[in-house]
Amino acid sequence: MPTPAQIDEQVQLERDQIRQGLKRLRDNTDALQQRSYASATVYGVASIDMLLPRLVKRIEDTNNRIHEGKNGAAFKEIAQYISDLEPLAAAAIALKLTFDKVFSYKEGSNQVQSVCDAIGSAVEDECQMRYYERCAPGLLNILKKNYWHKSSGTKQRLTSIQTLMNRKDIQQWQTWGRSNRIKLGSWLLDCIIASSQFNNSSGWFKRDMHQEGRKRINYIVPTPEFLVIKDKVMADAELFAPLAWPMLIEPNDWTNERAGGYLLNEVMRGHDMVRRGNHGCIQGEIPINFLNKIQKVALTLNPFTVQVAEELERLGREVGKFLPVVQHELPPKPVDIAENREARKAYNRAATHVQDLQHQEHKKSCRTRMTMEAVKRFKDVDKFYIPWSFDYRGRAYPIPAFLTPQDTDFGKSLLVFADGSYMTPEAEDWLAFQVATTFGLDKAPMTERLEWARNNHELFTLISQDPIGNLPLWEGVEEPWQFLAAAEEYYHCVVLADRQFTRLMVATDATCSGLQILAGLARDKSTARLVNVLPSDKPQDAYKVVSEEATPYCPESIQPYMDRKVVKRVVMTVPYNAKPFSNRGYIRDALAEKGVEISKEDLTKTVKAVRNAMDVIVPGPMAVMKWIEDEVATAIKAGKEHLEWSTPS
């Protein structure tokens, strides 16, 4: 039982989380508005999401009237400029720019002419990129790869592409002119104002004329009605704004009647036992007991990996998922930069490259910086606890984002159990299993992993005694940070034997849990063996087998790149009812990581090949999926609102 002092300390920590979360939300909103990025705020995203379908419909209706000859000459004049742009793209661009300009802190930003010009310019920029895509698709793709992600902002990206296209003698884009841009922007702004008039309301935006000296200037301003919506969205966001950290005492138990986890959660209701679930559903006793059980496991920081991380952060050295901010120095200026035009151009180009790299460093290092902030807060805490909850599928997830067993390789390496287990011969085998698996032998038979660990005592000794000096020995392995933690634990518990208790976490993972469950439901022995439900001489790899089956049916240009990584997310998610649309994204992203661009047609063929391969390799689970889909469709047609069934087990 926690003492009153410990409870007070935890309540104070949660109040700090609430305070800091609110401050971060408000500071982030304020910073985005200062930078004219209100479209990225919480209220901006929610509002655009709500208004976008109505605006798309209005633009489509207007386009249809063109073909019916019902629009005036004024619209036909600007229609030519967006003829190649689908209504969804035009609507998204117009809404983004409207929110950015109207809620910007910059003086005059919300003048009607300024807003219309910004919308028209952004639409022209998009059309210009599509023009380059039609004229020189291969060149544009190369330029994007080499320059796009290095640039600091949207405008700079476009400028880079324009400059490089001009150097390649691509026919120059014929600019629309400011007058036409403003006309186009004004029409889209009118569409936004009209579309926001829900149920004959006053709408979200209106034109407001101000007399400034001898001039009359029109501004676009939010209506009182929208300000009420904005305040409501922000108030709702603040309920979920508190930061989520580990707890200093055991989390409250979850029940069907009371919220668990954080002490103040019962009052704040910021976290549900089932995320995105139906609040009317009653959860069973077994899953609730499971959730409450894992919340009582005490953890602490691993002083060895924390010390190594702090030193590498000081050195600015990247290792695996540990990405500290690396400072890129500007090149020295040439002595004749003032007189020598070529030297000046070369310097400016090199300086821009360095500035682009530095800009990306801050983004890239975000998770590492936040993890190290959490480390500083909990470094001197003897033990802490993780509150957990379910998602709507029944999978358990930690509520905090950092210092949890489901973190990155680096994040996981920072944790050990607060209470150790006495070393036994079985414990030695499990430590050997962990150090070999994280080194990269995760597909090797168990005996091979144990043997490898026994043959590499010298490696573990070198790494444990001088991890920084021997960085090349461990930075390139499969999971470098967990390997580092395992090597140090194995060294002290087995090689040196100066530790009688081990606190290291040993990770074992299900092989495609969706297929495992469906294999059991279908009593499919071959699939059960393929996903390691049934024992075998060595670990089976379902992803590799599906990839090999699918490869001959993929486009020839894609076949050399097909492997388990390309199909993994598809095979993992199909048992959870993932459809071809999401499959396309997974395969496209996996190929992009290999530097491979795939056309729409080839992507369609590849997705079909992978799904057909699953029908061949895992027929039982796929048949169960098909049966469930058919039964659900039949039930919906019959008017059912929910389904209940019993599994064969």
Annotated model-derived regions:
Residues 1-571, 575-649:
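Non-catalytic nucleic-acid-binding interfaces of large nucleic-acid enzymes and RNP effectors
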